[in-house]
Amino acid sequence: MDWSEGDGSHSHGHMGDSCHGHGGGHSHGHGHSHGGSGFGGFMPAGFHGQLVPGPMDPTQQPRKSSHPEDSSSWDIIKATQFGALERCKELVEAGYDVRQPDKENVTLLHWAAINNRADIVKYYISKGAVIDQLGGDLNSTPLHWAIRQGHLSMVIQLMRYGADPSLADGEGYRGLHLAVLFQNMPIAAYLMAKGQEVDLPDLNGQTPLMLAAQKIIGPEPTNFLIKCNASVNAVDKVNRNSPLHCAVLAGNVDSVHILLEAGASVDMQNDNGHTAIDLAQQVHSPLLIHMLSVVKTERIKANSACLKLLNRYKVCLQSVFSVVVVGAFGAILDMRTESWLLKGILLACIMAVINLASRQLATVAVRSLIPSTGLIASVFWMVVTWVLWFLPDEPSAAVQMLFTVNITAVLYYYIRSCRTDPGHVKATEEEKKKNIVVLAEAGCLDPRIFCTSCMMRKPMRANHCFSCNACVAKQDHHSIWINGCIGARNHPFFVLFLVALNFLCIWMFYGSITYWSRHCPLHYSEEGIWGALTALMGCSPWLLYVFCFVFFHTTWASILLVLQLYQIAFLGLTTSERANLMHRQRKLPQAVSLRQNPFNHGVVKNLVNFFQWRFCGLCKPMVLDWTQQHPMGLGRDMFSSPDAV
């Protein structure tokens, strides 16, 4: 969800079926609303007036309207709506009571709040306006109106004057519930940071998460609330429905998926004894029935001792499994038999075992390990091949020493890349709340510097990784080869791992060519490429098999190494920063060189800073903790992408 203010009104409101029959329309019942539509805009029913053009930034005061009429003839309501402060002062000084409601039971403070007139609100408060005055058909406070309209700056101002967001309107909704229903997530975050509980029930006993799951079709704001630690198994007061019950009744597939991922119980029963699956059958939704049944079956399996053991030791077991599978394929190909039918049957059996294991045992977490454990298996069989095939033909101690150093470097830098914290940005709940309040009140609650997934302030050059579900300082990319992120703290180790891996592959090419030249005489000029491949296959199928996956690893590792060194040395950028800049360049009328960025200090200095080279004091690298480097304001971090939920 984009946290930038837009023009569109949200028609979700409070319409639609409710878990407990609470579902009235959302209208104030008054006839005029002026000012910007706001973030998640709200337009009262029966609107007939003209909207004053509003700002795109919800933290700024609206522009004054260039109305053709002379404001000296306006009544105080119209002057308030259009921001004519001097006319308002004139009428108040003439004796108008700022606490007096109009014929629709709406006070001047309501009109100032819904139109985001900060200076007029300040003036009315100084003249004795009641901050939490209830008014309108929905019996709402000015704060409720500002929340519905999406005016974050007005919400902040009213709360500074003592407005109480925990008060309920005529429909029973408190401030946080309204922010969620109108999908004003910055306001919801601010209210929670100021002390509103994420599971605060409305007067009908429903939490914000229940309302989101029931009334707003789509992943948000359900996902947002779960990230704020909303309870997925809370129940309402009327029917004891959980958020999952509400989502199923509303047919909200996205919310159901998110709630299940968050661990919502599929066995919880409401007052009528119905589970979520029972309700899915009642609403005749085959998709929801399938989703809920699959999750229920998976959770039953997850309680088995076998799967618990697999999840506990998944890295080791998956590595062993990959080593066995890669070795089994090669061993079958290397069998001394002329029967390709037998080899085909054995290979088919191996594929069947893999398929069975993936269906019965492999979870999403286990499947994500396949590339990294496949790489580990490949390196293992490279070493075995060197020892059993190449070592007897290579008596040179220097070559053996260099190979040993190389394989040690590969293992060392690979482990360091995997085990070193890439720079995960961490913050306590109190720090998160403090940052939200500070950024909101400074007008900087913006996705470029505030992560809407982690709910915390992002350091400069940090990005949110959706695979790791964390913000990573100076993130380069998420690598499938280490099953983790490459960031500020493990990036040098990863680059050195690529260097060592490329040298290992070169040694394997050297050993393969040397072995073939001695044991497999080839006549390429006479037999052609297919004849040569046939000869190699007949000479040593295993070696040709190993050569193929060595070639594969050489291809991606060499390309990735060249790109990494180019970005580090010549640009001073990470992969994600380069991608963001290239995307923005396409929108610019004139091309701008990627080298023109504040992090590019020249080739030598870039390399010194990246690898932290000192050379006995000859070099002085820049030492920075990128998890603590914060931009000073909007626009300072030109390389960050908005990680909006």
Swiss-Prot record:
Xref: Pfam families: Ank_2 (PF12796), DHHC (PF01529)
One annotated GO molecular function: palmitoyltransferase activity
SMART domains xrefs: ANK
Segments forming domain DHHC: 449-499
Superkingdom, natural source: Eukaryota
Biased composition (Gly residues): 34-43
Compositionally biased intervals (Basic and acidic residues): 7-20
Annotated SUPFAM superfamilies: Ankyrin repeat
Intervals, Lumenal compartment: 336, 391-394, 514-542
Sequence ranges of the ANK repeats: 104-133, 138-167, 171-200, 204-234, 239-268
Cytoplasmic side: 1-314, 358-369, 416-492, 564-645
Biased composition (Basic residues): 23-33
InterPro entries: Ankyrin_rpt (IPR002110), Ankyrin_rpt-contain_sf (IPR036770), Palmitoyltrfase_DHHC (IPR001594)
Gene Ontology, cellular component aspect: cytoplasmic vesicle membrane; Golgi membrane
Any Gene Ontology biological process: regulation of ectodermal cell fate specification
Transmembrane segments: 315-335, 337-357, 370-390, 395-415, 493-513, 543-563
Topological category with respect to the lipid bilayer: Multi-pass membrane protein
Positions of region (Disordered): 1-73
Places the protein is found: Golgi apparatus membrane; Cytoplasmic vesicle membrane
Protein's job: Putative palmitoyltransferase that could catalyze the addition of palmitate onto various protein substrates.
Family from the record: Belongs to the DHHC palmitoyltransferase family. AKR/ZDHHC17 subfamily.
Written domain comment of the UniProt record: The DHHC domain is required for palmitoyltransferase activity.
Name the record gives this protein: Putative palmitoyltransferase ZDHHC13
Gene assigned in the entry: zdhhc13
